Amino acid sequence: MHRPSDYPSTLLWLLDETHVTVTAGTAIAILWTQKAHCLWFAAGALGSTLIARIIKKMIRQPRPPPSSPTTKAAPVRPKQTYGMPSTHSTALGFYFTYMWPLLPLATSSVWGERAALAVITGLTLWSRVELGYHTVTQVMVGTAVGVNSALGWKALWNSNSAIEIQLQTLIDTVRDKVVSRFS
């Protein structure tokens, strides 16, 4: 793991580490809420990134060439995978599109939460280009993959109530078995 001082700015370091906080936050939300919709959302986000990785292996477009060492936004570490589409952008597109209509979650400030979601998403998408990990096109295509995945995944959820029933039954069964082992 890189230190903040390895980056051109602390902001870029924070944005480069969003995958850790987003993954941890999603896992905590699943464990905390124990709700089928939360698990469905996480499975869709994971599925969208798997789709991006498959597309990436099919297209095989390289990442942008490394910047010169004198460039302020020189990448911290070279990425060894292909760049099209950006998997981070796919996940961000999915999260943004799926979460937007669900906000507010816990407060009455719908526009405050939506503004925070938009700013964090926008800054993180920008950072993928600024750090030299992706081209603008790779980020845009990744975002489009995520947006379309979220729309399809949400449509599946809305059109089939059996999904919620089956997932909630699974969650409750697993929880009960885990709790009974420690009781």
Named regions from a protein language model:
Residues 68-183:
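Membrane-embedded catalytic cores of phosphoryl/pyrophosphoryl-handling enzymes
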Residues 1-30, 36-44, 49-82, 173-183:
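N-terminal transmembrane-helix/juxtamembrane module of multi-pass inner/ER membrane proteins
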Residues 29-34, 100-104:
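Structural signal for the C-terminal ends of transmembrane alpha-helices
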